[in-house]
């Protein structure tokens, strides 16, 4: 297994660890909550960095593999979806935004399956990357700033996170629409 694929697998392993710390941050004292939110944020940030590094190293060193093409987006989806689920339970992300994110991911997966059947290669587009970066930055903002905020700042952090989540929802909807439009020929060719 090459280094980019090891980084992808590291991200897969970090997902349940992130989920544990995000879940236990709901219990205990304010200090306990802040500490576990910060740990969850650090884990998420490390996992996000591996997302950048695995793709960069794979392309730079000509180490792109079918395994990486499959596992990298799957690891990303697991990581960001888990974080948004916890943000919904913290009432800083609307379930509508989560539904938009999930719908887009299922739609894109469907398009990729159609593409695989026809032997079509679909390149990632800029809008998908913008969406991913915005989602990851929003999640990192919530976990880091939320953990470090004082009692008087909680309202601002919650409000800012809600606004950022709606921007994520809009970016997700836009990137999904563009992706589906760019690949509409696959639907026409489907039997």
Where do the language-model regions lie?
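Alpha-helical transmembrane bundles and membrane-interface segments of multipass inner-membrane proteins
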Residues: 1-191
